[in-house]
Regions:
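Long, compositionally biased, glycine/small-hydrophobic-enriched stretches that function as flexible linkers
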Residues: 1-160, 168-173, 184, 191-208, ...
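Alpha-helix-loop-beta-strand connector modules within alpha/beta enzyme cores
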Residues: 133-144, 192-229, 273-288, 310-325
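Hydrophobic faces of well-ordered beta-strands that scaffold small-molecule active sites
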Residues: 148-156, 176-180, 226-234, 253-257, ...
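Generic structural signal for hydrophobic
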Residues: 166-169, 246, 281-282, 320-321
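C-terminal basic regulatory modules in eukaryotic proteins
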Residues: 221-222, 247, 253
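Active-site capping/gating regions of soluble enzymes
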Residues: 270-281, 297-345
Length: 345
């Protein structure tokens, strides 16, 4: 079925949305957030935790408390790596153990240090590029199921119980498996570490949980001769960090929208729009498809009376996604409306 839409009106809507997106991008451009800074550290290889507290949080919190985050966490950690001959992970561990003060060692000028920082970032970026290439090769070899693709949700709270559910879903025809996050994870200002076996209404999004589920679905996909896509949720206070961890573990799709957190979680809109932009930059680079969250906006509203708000959001989301480098094929726009089927147009 093809909708006979007024193309001139669609063009006008896109132009209006583009103006809004341009204004947002001008605000985002010169700014960062603590989550963005933690993400950069994670991409440099700082992904361990001590007593459940991620090293990235320890470093960023330490710098922020001392008013020294303005130059960026990567600058301070990278400077220590260069001066002391340490890897980012080694330097971060020393900071966490109170064996190293990042502010107490000689400093390189930021411009002089930049090439070295780029070197430190290369292993993480290469890993993401390799994952993207591997996904493309596997999809070419195994193919995807016939359209429309079947999307199934699993979430027991225990990643070890999620795995057999996800594999069973794939064996019954699911092409895409989404693992819902535990209730309230969007309001945690850190990403839990390791495999988790207790969640509430969902399973924690962690790098290890991503790795476990990716491995399981790859094994099932090989057996079935179909590539099974893995989905998680990239929103809330750690939006860009989860994007980075998903990219490092070859997730295929992310729910990636700031507006739900603004409307329903009371998250600071300036912070979360900055976070959203960086998370979408990562998803664009990783070849990950994003889904926006317009269907969630309508859970407390009448779908017909407020349909125009969804359309407006979709146009704006499209323009913000393009500004972050996402290609049209990577954009999935939420549009699940709960409408009485007997309602006349």
């Amino acid at each position: 079925m093809k909708l006979q839409l007024d193309t001139s009106l669609v063009k006008e809507c896109r132009q209006a949305a583009g103006k809004i997106a341009d204004e947002v991008q001008r605000f985002i451009g010169p700014r960062s957030t603590q989550s963005v800074e933690r993400t950069v550290l994670r991409l440099m290889g700082v992904n361990d935790a001590i007593d459940g507290v991620p090293l990235a949080n320890i470093i960023v919190d330490n710098l922020a408390a001392r008013g020294e985050l303005g130059l960026g966490a990567a600058y301070w950690l990278g400077n220590a790596c260069k001066q002391l001959g340490l890897s980012p992970q080694e330097a971060a561990a020393k900071v966490a153990a109170n064996e190293l003060d990042l502010l107490a060692i000689p400093r390189e000028e930021p411009g002089v240090l930049r090439p070295f920082l780029q070197e430190l970032a290369q292993p993480g970026l290469r890993k993401i590029v390799d994952n993207r290439r591997q996904r493309e090769q596997m999809q070419q070899k195994l193919k995807m199921g016939p359209a429309p693709l079947l999307y199934v949700i699993v979430a027991t709270g225990d990643i070890m119980r999620d795995v057999p559910q996800a594999q069973a879903a794939a064996e019954q025809g699911a092409d895409i498996v989404a693992v819902i996050r535990t209730t309230g994870q969007s309001l945690l200002d850190y990403v839990p570490h390791g495999a988790t076996r207790e969640g509430f209404g969902g399973t924690y999004a962690t790098q290890e949980n991503f790795r476990i589920m990716r491995k399981a679905l790859d094994e099932t996909g090989e057996k079935l001769g179909r590539y099974i896509m893995l989905v998680n949720y990239c929103s809330g206070l750690c939006m860009p960090e989860i994007a980075a961890l998903g990219a490092l573990e070859r997730l295929d799709m992310m729910l990636n929208d700031a507006l739900y957190g603004i409307l329903f979680r009371d998250i600071n809109m300036e912070r979360t729009l900055i976070d959203q932009n960086f998370s979408r930059v990562i998803n664009a680079y990783a070849g990950i498809i994003i889904n926006s969250g317009e269907d969630n906006y309508l859970t407390t509203s009448d779908a017909v009376a407020e349909a125009h708000t969804v359309t407006a959001s979709q146009f704006i989301n499209e323009q913000l996604a393009l500004a972050a480098g996402l290609s049209p094929w990577q954009m999935g726009l939420g549009h699940a409306f709960e409408i009485d089927p007997d309602l006349e147009d």
